[in-house]
């Protein structure tokens, strides 16, 4: 999404909706974001943009090392403010969470690794990852699934976008034991948030020149919850007559993605479905190591891998694929209006993959993470030496 102005067009679209009162908070936030851009421009004059970095768990720290090494070699004017938050390394507390939130709110932009959520219930249902999303209102997760030239997969020349609502739905952390051995889990679906993510998807399609939006749902079974989501998507679709609108049941969508993914352009869906489809679609173009992602609120932008996987079994083995994180970092630079550096890094990563001499194990090669980083750095200035 292009720079900080991307938030402005989204907010203007939301404010122009039929119920302006529903978007009043976003309008106020957009004004704050505009002010933050002025602050960022001041920082740029001084030499760097402040960005919050959250390495996370698993191979996250190794991937962030790759980002820092490539940024250093490319002379990117970004200053990382690094924080550590982990539920599995005893590095989590309310104080640490507030420190991270404070940094992210001040900088408006962050790059993060996967914060692993343990299976065990320890008295708190909401993970730190989920709490960060809620407190920053990171309602829209965007994953651009695109084939990488030179890397052959079963389906090539894919180009589709998955937009996921990620502040409600099944991830509402509302569970309780109503009777011994009986657990009730509540799925929350609201008109305001369903309208908001639908408008985001159609605005995204309009801005990016895409022709179709597919709403993914299970309204045939969850007639009220997913029924409301689907109704909101249908209502918003009427405001965009130039964008083709389709609906598809989630289970059929999974099958269609495997059989004929070329039929899709932009897909919009509730929280849990988005989490599943993100990972499924990433597998179509090479897996979790090659697909970047990002999350947006009206004020903040967070850049991460598209398929959130800590890859704990690879920790310390120097085999993690930094492609997804480097491409996400490139998208972050574009968001900051650092187009030159963004293109330089993205082009270097894609050249390494296209040449095919340096590939990590997940891509069928034997190269290490370090090998990949060095190769990317070597392709940053192909005509400069």
UniProtKB/Swiss-Prot annotation:
<dbReference type="GO" id="GO:0016616">
    <property type="term" value="F:oxidoreductase activity, acting on the CH-OH group of donors, NAD or NADP as acceptor"/>
</dbReference>
<comment type="subunit">
    <text>Heterooligomer of subunits alpha (IDH3A), beta (IDH3B), and gamma (IDH3G) in the apparent ratio of 2:1:1. The heterodimer containing one IDH3A and one IDH3B subunit and the heterodimer containing one IDH3A and one IDH3G subunit assemble into a heterotetramer (which contains two subunits of IDH3A, one of IDH3B and one of IDH3G) and further into the heterooctamer.</text>
</comment>
<dbReference type="InterPro" id="IPR024084">
    <property type="entry name" value="IsoPropMal-DH-like_dom"/>
</dbReference>
<keyword id="KW-0809">Transit peptide</keyword>
<feature type="transit peptide" description="Mitochondrion">
    <location>
        <begin position="1"/>
        <end position="34"/>
    </location>
</feature>
<keyword id="KW-0496">Mitochondrion</keyword>
<dbReference type="GO" id="GO:0000287">
    <property type="term" value="F:magnesium ion binding"/>
</dbReference>
<dbReference type="InterPro" id="IPR004434">
    <property type="entry name" value="Isocitrate_DH_NAD"/>
</dbReference>
<comment type="function">
    <text>Plays a structural role to facilitate the assembly and ensure the full activity of the enzyme catalyzing the decarboxylation of isocitrate (ICT) into alpha-ketoglutarate. The heterodimer composed of the alpha (IDH3A) and beta (IDH3B) subunits and the heterodimer composed of the alpha (IDH3A) and gamma (IDH3G) subunits, have considerable basal activity but the full activity of the heterotetramer (containing two subunits of IDH3A, one of IDH3B and one of IDH3G) requires the assembly and cooperative function of both heterodimers.</text>
</comment>
<dbReference type="InterPro" id="IPR019818">
    <property type="entry name" value="IsoCit/isopropylmalate_DH_CS"/>
</dbReference>
<dbReference type="GO" id="GO:0006102">
    <property type="term" value="P:isocitrate metabolic process"/>
</dbReference>
<comment type="similarity">
    <text>Belongs to the isocitrate and isopropylmalate dehydrogenases family.</text>
</comment>
<protein>
    <recommendedName>
        <fullName>Isocitrate dehydrogenase [NAD] subunit beta, mitochondrial</fullName>
    </recommendedName>
</protein>
<dbReference type="GO" id="GO:0005739">
    <property type="term" value="C:mitochondrion"/>
</dbReference>
<dbReference type="GO" id="GO:0006099">
    <property type="term" value="P:tricarboxylic acid cycle"/>
</dbReference>
<keyword id="KW-0007">Acetylation</keyword>
<dbReference type="GO" id="GO:0051287">
    <property type="term" value="F:NAD binding"/>
</dbReference>
<dbReference type="Pfam" id="PF00180">
    <property type="entry name" value="Iso_dh"/>
</dbReference>
<feature type="modified residue" description="N6-acetyllysine">
    <location>
        <position position="199"/>
    </location>
</feature>
<keyword id="KW-0816">Tricarboxylic acid cycle</keyword>
